[in-house]
């Protein structure tokens, strides 16, 4: 074997150097050459990838060396290729696997020889510990930057290293005397020494081929996995076995040796913070190692190296137990990932020393004698990887969309493929960058690392930054007392607070709108308003502008808060005027704009509202349809809306609509769900609960009333008005309503509500009904709600005020009339100066309306197209809130041209169902039946005659079954019996048949699926499980869109248009749409380019109009325990089951290999395998559906 070539033996390179200088006269290498007296070589190749070649290239350039990179086809866009002076692909495309390319010894040596390379540095991993590679490099006449091949063979084999330590009288952990290849040998060791043990690959490191086994049941599978991983990673499946030490520290010593037998140490590093035996965070020097133990470890490390004439850089590794006894593990004959922290505390460039030693320099020539080497301060290194800690550190793949590094004093970054646009594949190690920070003390260095981690911005792939931040902030790490299994032993480390990634998620939504248009259901076209809304200026009685920078602080809310619900009710009743409830924030936009007004637009006028309506009875702003629509269509949290509005309007009581035993859902729920919901609503800001039941079922109503009482809210027990009580032939007459009032009063409500949802309460009927109630209950406050569908709303509300009502409903003028509430301006003008004066400033109310006039144009895509009042409502009795939705639904069902027929069918459907009170959800039942009749061309007679064979809408069957309560006068027969066939018939309120919800379990499930859970989340889930889950998934993808101005929520900006998004106080994004790229026929995507705070970002968006074959695998659905998903991206290397096989919980299903790691996919529960969707060799992404396991 040829000896390593030394400078004095080198061939004459004059011709090469002359040619090189002719070609590169102006290169940096020529200018630097004078600074390198020792270096006589000209070109170095690094046989590696990622960050270590870049690290080596930088030092090589400082030493005036030309640099050569090699790369696999999969790495053709990697950064290390660009950082070298020359770069050559290993083999041809498809010739090698992604990892195999970097293990292709002959090919790499061939490239080096063809391109005049003098030195080859192996980096770490891959061929760095391969003696054959080192030997072939030197046999080819080049210099291997590392130990001799003989040293690699003797020390790289951990068994040989162990025998060496025993000869040198260095302590070792009890273990097998040599390598083992058979399971029986491992079994024999455990029979002698017991458990726990550790199985280690005899060649290589980095945690591959390493398994801790704690009992006999795990032994065989762990042995097979360790040998398989070792064979895949290092080409040799040999392993050895040791006794496993519990909670030791992992201390390693950095060594340097020259070609003349000289060896020095560069002190120690503490590498105890590990996961699966792979180092995560390293510290230099070790913080709490006793001085005498440190000195003995350092001396033994040097003794071991000298005993084998160690050359170049290496690391001696030790375990230190809790009694400070230390044991030699191995010597790694290569540079380590964590060499950076030693460089930071010693000031020594280890890579430069490596190269110069390889070139023949002595330690003395380099000034590296032991007496000259000392440490200063501390350094800590973190490895930032594309791993998802919340999913067992499964590697994430994809495109890095944003990459912003940390920096500043004491921060060193050694990067690899961390840059915007980089594609992270499953083929290689997941590390993006090493972040090393130094400080004069351990605590200063620790704080600096935490600051640097928080400063990083990496988007497009998951990273371990949240986990690292949690780790470095843990008290044990702060104390510096971690051990090797600290991460596994400390589950609280995984209570992560991740980066919100708000800007990039927002861009994903904006990009989708730019490519595909708005996806908001019900939107037709784009907003008519293109400019900004001009906010009104309010003036006081003296004509001076009001300061609306802060909200008003005096109103009926203060009476309620200070004196309680009973006193509040007495004060309302004692008030001489008729108060106003403004419905603009809920029912008005529900009736005219499909409930689509967003929180941001309510908040923009909230302070002005608190001043202008300071004397209002309440603001109706929550509950009813706004609750589910917020999540379903606006992608907002209704609780967040309530919290924000409450803060902005502290002086006016907030009123919500509560559907009795339904809560805000469309069907009955268990009683405990209603009580829980009301408690959360009261806590979050609701004051007055307008409780009603769609059928005026007193038993249903009682549940809601008692729940509000328990929550200590204001109970407004509400009776729904339907029909025409002046018509003696109608079902609902005055005695009916008075009897209802008598029953409701028994529940001790604070206020009585009358809910005229269709606007059919005529003025003369209003006088009779309100007057009769007032006469019977002179001390009970009365509040009347109506719609102006017939155009008589103002007259009816004035009649109510004159008859003794304490509060009536109205909406801002621009959102009033038709299916909405009567005009507030008209009511104020009618009552102004009378004994019923509401006490509001008409000028301020009118000023407020200028905002809503503009805003209605912004929401023009949701207009129903109504042009005026519809007195026909007295016939069909369609509720105002339903009428606009019914028009839209009819259009969607292709019945738009049959609207008149639909209205007549609504009357017929109502008669068929027994003339029910029509309000959500019973109004939906009537509407569904009406559309069903029109679609199927059915008459009322047809429905009755064919009821036994027709497939009725679900809502109709639920009503007939009794799931919505008991209607006045009973269910219609024979329709009910015929339609239900074999379904049950309930004769009591449905809640009595429902089991209480397990609210604690719901909270646990939410936390498990989404990382956090509040009681508000539980309440939302209880009302609308599927809607809540869809909303959470949407937010996970696109973030909180409630901060986005409505114009850009509904339509894309113009190219080059700049707009602002305020994420929170003091944090504003300045955005500009730059371009929309062409369609990629391969992916069906377009690239959308935005400027964000002056920085160009891009997002890839699926073009929904493109026809691209969808080859994506189905995903395992969260929450469905029968579906088994891939825990990470990778290749399926083994399938252990087949369809129909019975498995037990924990049985292996398949084995994945990714990023040089293997992972067994286990059965989550016992059952039978079905729908096995993968086979050996398949590539899968994280959460791809592998199979289903049907529970036994």
Curated annotation (Swiss-Prot):
Free-text function comment from the UniProt entry: Pyruvate carboxylase catalyzes a 2-step reaction, involving the ATP-dependent carboxylation of the covalently attached biotin in the first step and the transfer of the carboxyl group to pyruvate in the second.
UniProt domain ATP-grasp: residue ranges: 162-359
GO terms (BP aspect): gluconeogenesis
Domain named Biotinyl-binding: residues: 1115-1190
Residues recorded as bearing N6-biotinyllysine in the entry: 1156
Cofactor(s) needed for function: biotin; Zn(2+)
Reaction catalysis annotation: hydrogencarbonate + pyruvate + ATP = oxaloacetate + ADP + phosphate + H(+)
Binding-site list for substrate: 586-590, 659, 920
Location(s), subcellular: Cytoplasm
Pyruvate carboxyltransferase domain sequence ranges: 578-846
Gene: pyc
A GO molecular-function annotation: metal ion binding
InterPro entries assigned: Aldolase_TIM, ATP-grasp, BC-like_N, Biotin_BS, Biotin_carboxylation_dom, Biotin_COase_C, Biotin_lipoyl, Carboxylase_cons_dom
Broadest EC class assigned to this enzyme: ligase
Species of origin: Aspergillus niger
EC number: 6.4.1.1
Protein name: Pyruvate carboxylase
Domain Biotin carboxylation: residue ranges: 40-492
Pathway(s) this gene product operates in, as recorded in its UniProt entry: Carbohydrate biosynthesis; gluconeogenesis
Keywords attached to this entry: ATP-binding, Biotin, Cytoplasm, Gluconeogenesis, Ligase, Metal-binding, Multifunctional enzyme, Nucleotide-binding, Pyruvate, Zinc
Residues annotated for ATP binding in this entry: 158, 242, 277
Residues at the active site: 334
Sequence positions that bind a divalent metal cation: 587, 755, 785, 787
N6-carboxylysine modifications at: 755
């Amino acid at each position: 074997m040829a000896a390593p070539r030394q400078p004095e033996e080198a061939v004459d390179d004059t011709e090469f150097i002359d040619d090189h200088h002719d070609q590169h006269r102006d290169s940096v290498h020529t200018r630097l050459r004078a600074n390198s007296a020792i270096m006589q070589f000209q070109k170095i190749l690094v046989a590696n990838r990622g960050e270590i070649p870049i690290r080596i290239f930088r030092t090589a350039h400082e030493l005036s060396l030309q640099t050569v990179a090699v790369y696999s086809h999969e790495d053709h866009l990697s950064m290390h290729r660009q950082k070298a002076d020359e770069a050559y692909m290993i083999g041809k495309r498809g010739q090698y696997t992604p990892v195999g390319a970097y293990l292709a010894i002959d090919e790499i040596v061939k490239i080096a020889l063809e391109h005049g390379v003098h030195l080859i540095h192996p980096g770490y991993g891959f061929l760095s510990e391969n003696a054959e590679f080192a030997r072939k490099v030197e046999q080819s006449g080049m210099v291997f930057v590392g130990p001799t091949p003989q040293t690699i063979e003797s020390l790289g084999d951990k068994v040989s290293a162990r025998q060496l330590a025993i000869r040198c009288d260095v302590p070792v952990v009890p273990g097998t005397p040599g390598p083992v290849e058979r399971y029986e040998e491992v079994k024999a060791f455990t029979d002698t020494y017991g458990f726990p043990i550790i199985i280690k690959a005899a060649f290589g490191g980095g945690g591959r081929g390493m398994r801790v086994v704690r009992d006999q049941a795990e032994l065989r599978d762990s042995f097979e996995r360790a040998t398989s991983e070792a064979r895949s990673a290092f080409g040799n499946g040999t392993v050895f076995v040791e006794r496993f030490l519990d909670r030791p520290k992992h201390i390693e010593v950095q060594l340097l040796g020259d070609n003349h037998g000289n060896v020095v140490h560069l002190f120690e590093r503490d590498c105890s913070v590990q996961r699966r035996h792979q180092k995560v965070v390293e510290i230099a020097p070790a913080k709490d190692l006793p001085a005498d133990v440190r000195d003995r470890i350092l001396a033994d490390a040097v003794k071991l190296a000298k005993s084998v004439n160690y050359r170049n850089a290496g690391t001696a590794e030790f375990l230190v137990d809790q009694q400070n006894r230390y044991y030699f593990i191995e010597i790694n004959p290569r540079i380590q990932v964590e060499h950076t922290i030693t460089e930071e505390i010693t000031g020594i460039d280890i890579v430069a020393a490596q190269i110069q030693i390889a070139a023949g320099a002595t330690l003395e020539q380099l000034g590296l004698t032991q007496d000259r080497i000392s440490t200063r301060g501390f350094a800590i290194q973190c490895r930032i990887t594309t791993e998802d800690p919340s999913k067992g550190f499964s590697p994430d793949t994809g495109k890095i969309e944003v990459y912003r590094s940390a920096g500043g004093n004491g921060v060193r970054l050694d990067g690899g493929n961390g840059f915007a646009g980089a594609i992270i594949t499953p083929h290689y190690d997941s590390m993006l960058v090493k972040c090393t920070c130094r400080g004069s003390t351990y605590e200063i260095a620790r704080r600096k690392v935490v600051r640097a981690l928080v400063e990083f911005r990496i988007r497009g792939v998951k990273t371990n930054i949240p986990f690292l931040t949690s780790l470095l902030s843990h008290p044990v790490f702060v104390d510096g007392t971690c051990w090797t299994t600290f991460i596994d032993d400390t589950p609280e480390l995984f209570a992560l607070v991740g980066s919100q990634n708000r800007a990039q998620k927002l861009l994903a939504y904006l990009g989708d709108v730019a490519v595909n248009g708005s996806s908001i259901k019900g939107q037709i076209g784009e907003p008519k308003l293109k400019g900004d809304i001009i906010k009104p200026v309010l003036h006081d009685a003296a004509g001076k502008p009001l300061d609306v920078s802060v909200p008003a602080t005096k109103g009926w809310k203060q009476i309620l808060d200070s004196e309680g619900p009973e006193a509040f009710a007495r004060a309302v009743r004692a008030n001489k005027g008729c108060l106003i409830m403004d419905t603009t924030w809920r029912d008005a936009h529900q009736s005219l704009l499909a409930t689509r007004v967003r929180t941001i637009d309510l908040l923009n006028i909230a302070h002005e509202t608190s001043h202008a309506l300071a004397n209002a009875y309440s603001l109706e702003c929550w509950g009813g349809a706004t609750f589910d629509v917020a999540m379903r269509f606006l992608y907002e949290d209704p609780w967040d809306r309530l919290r924000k509005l409450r803060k902005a309007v502290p002086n006016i009581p907030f009123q919500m609509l509560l559907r009795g035993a339904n809560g805000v859902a469309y069907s009955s729920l268990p009683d405990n769900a209603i009580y829980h919901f009301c408690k959360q609503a009261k806590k979050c800001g609701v004051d007055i609960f307008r409780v009603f039941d769609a059928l005026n079922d007193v038993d249903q109503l009682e549940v809601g009333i008692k729940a509000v009482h328990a929550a200590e809210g204001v109970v407004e027990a509400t009776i729904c008005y339907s029909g025409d009580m002046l018509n003696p032939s109608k079902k609902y007459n005055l005695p009916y309503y008075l009897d209802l009032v008598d029953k409701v009063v028994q529940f001790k409500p604070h206020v009585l509500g009358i809910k005229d949802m269709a606007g059919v309460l005529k003025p003369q009927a209003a006088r009779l009904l309100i007057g009769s109630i007032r006469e019977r209950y002179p001390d009970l406050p009365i509040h009347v709600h109506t719609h102006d569908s017939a155009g008589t709303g103002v007259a009816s509300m004035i009649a109510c005020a004159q008859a003794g009502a304490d509060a009536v409903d109205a909406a801002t003028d621009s959102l009033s009339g038709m299916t909405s509430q009567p005009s507030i301006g008209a009511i104020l003008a009618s009552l102004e100066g009378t004994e019923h004066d509401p006490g509001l400033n008409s000028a301020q109310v009118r000023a407020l309306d200028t905002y809503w006039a503009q805003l209605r144009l912004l929401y023009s895509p949701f207009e129903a197209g109504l042009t005026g009042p519809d007195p026909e409502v007295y016939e069909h009795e369609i509720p105002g809130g339903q009428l606009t939705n019914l028009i839209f639904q009819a259009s969607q069902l292709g019945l738009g041209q049959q609207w008149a027929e639909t209205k007549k069918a609504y009357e017929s459907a109502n008669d068929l169902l027994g003339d029910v009170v029509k309000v959500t959800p019973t109004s939906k039942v009537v509407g569904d039946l009406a559309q069903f009749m029109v679609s199927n061309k059915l008459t009322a007679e047809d429905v009755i005659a064919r009821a036994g064979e027709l497939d009725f809408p679900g809502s109709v069957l639920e009503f007939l079954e009794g799931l919505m309560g008991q209607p006045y006068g009973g269910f219609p027969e024979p329709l009910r019996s015929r339609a239900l066939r074999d379904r049950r018939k309930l004769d009591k309120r449905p809640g009595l048949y429902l089991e209480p919800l397990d609210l604690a379990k719901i909270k646990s499930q939410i936390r498990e699926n989404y990382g956090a859970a509040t009681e508000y989340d539980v309440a939302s889930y209880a009302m609308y499980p599927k809607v809540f889950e869809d909303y959470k998934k949407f937010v996970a993808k696109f973030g909180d869109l409630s901060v986005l101005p409505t114009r850009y929520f509904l339509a894309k900006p113009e190219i080059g248009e700049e707009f602002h998004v305020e994420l929170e106080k003091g944090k504003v994004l300045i955005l500009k749409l730059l371009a929309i790229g062409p369609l990629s026929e391969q992916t069906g995507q377009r690239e959308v380019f935005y400027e964000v705070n002056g920085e160009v970002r891009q997002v890839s968006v699926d073009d929904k109009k493109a026809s691209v074959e969808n080859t994506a695998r189905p995903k395992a659905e969260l929450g469905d325990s029968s579906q088994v998903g891939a825990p990470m991206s990778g290749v399926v290397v083994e399938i252990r089951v087949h369809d129909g096989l019975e498995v037990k919980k924990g049985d292996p299903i398949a084995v994945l290999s990714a990023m040089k790691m293997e992972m067994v996919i286990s059965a989550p529960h016992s059952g039978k395998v079905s729908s096995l969707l993968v086979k050996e060799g398949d590539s899968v992404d994280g959460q791809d559906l592998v199979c289903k396991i049907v529970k036994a």
